[in-house]
Amino acid sequence: MKIGVLALQGAFREHLNMLGTLGAEAVEVRKAEELPELSGLIIPGGESTTITKLLDIFGMAEPIKALAKKGMPIWGTCAGMICLAKELPGDISGVKPLGLMDITVRRNAFGRQVNSFEAMLKVKGLDKADFPAVFIRAPLVEKTGKGVEILSKLPDGTIVAVRENNLLAISFHPELSGDNRFHRYFVQMAKTYKA
């Protein structure tokens, strides 16, 4: 089983390191031809405009969509959540999301870099201990479709983690938390996929 981390831009090394703590085979992915050999793909945080443009430039958007439809697990964190969304309200400044998840996501919902924060979250599917979530220029989920499961919310009710079948999206950066439980959760999703 091999888990790929999209390595075109963003926090891919941190995801690779976190997967390494679990003994998972993790690889950097930069070409469309590397995708079919994967059991799962992580789209990391970074700059959503840049990531979606590079997905088009490198011919990866359509193969990722096809693999998602076949059931390959895909996990988007922060900017990766934006990439997976069907709808982005407001000024999307050239972002072309993959449109895979039935969610409406607002970019930079918590403000600029200086407004970054950490929060302890209860997360459905993880053990009872709260998860230390790091929010940096994070998006939020404004609306979910019928098939979308809400995994976590902030105390004010803001949705920050969702799952729709083989697709997982979270607003924050679990790779920066020092806690590998979300990565373990995704590895378990990847184990169920038959390429």
From Swiss-Prot:
PROSITE patterns in alphabetical order: PDXT_SNO_1, PDXT_SNO_2
Quote one Gene Ontology molecular function term: pyridoxal 5'-phosphate synthase (glutamine hydrolysing) activity
Give one Pfam family. Answer: SNO
The reaction(s) this protein catalyses = aldehydo-D-ribose 5-phosphate + D-glyceraldehyde 3-phosphate + L-glutamine = pyridoxal 5'-phosphate + L-glutamate + phosphate + 3 H2O + H(+); L-glutamine + H2O = L-glutamate + NH4(+)
The enzyme's E.C. designation:
4.3.3.6, 3.5.1.2
Protein residues bound to L-glutamine? G46, E47, S48, R107, I136, R137
List membrane-spanning regions: none
Superkingdom of this entry's organism? Bacteria
Query: Could you name the active-site residues?
Result: C78 (nucleophile), H173 (charge relay system), E175 (charge relay system)
Q: Which Gene3D superfamilies match?
A: 3.40.50.880
| Keywords (A to Z) from UniProt | Glutamine amidotransferase, Hydrolase, Lyase, Pyridoxal phosphate
Q: Does the keyword Chaperone apply?
A: no
Q: In which pathway does it act?
A: Cofactor biosynthesis; pyridoxal 5'-phosphate biosynthesis
One GO CC annotation: cytosol
- Alphabetical GO biological process terms: glutamine catabolic process; pyridoxal phosphate biosynthetic process; pyridoxine metabolic process
How does this polypeptide assemble, per the annotation?
A: In the presence of PdxS, forms a dodecamer of heterodimers. Only shows activity in the heterodimer.
What HAMAP family does the record point to?
PdxT
The job of this chain, per UniProt, is described as:
Catalyzes the hydrolysis of glutamine to glutamate and ammonia as part of the biosynthesis of pyridoxal 5'-phosphate. The resulting ammonia molecule is channeled to the active site of PdxS.
What protein is this chain from?
A: Pyridoxal 5'-phosphate synthase subunit PdxT
| Source species | Dehalococcoides mccartyi (strain ATCC BAA-2100 / JCM 16839 / KCTC 5957 / BAV1)
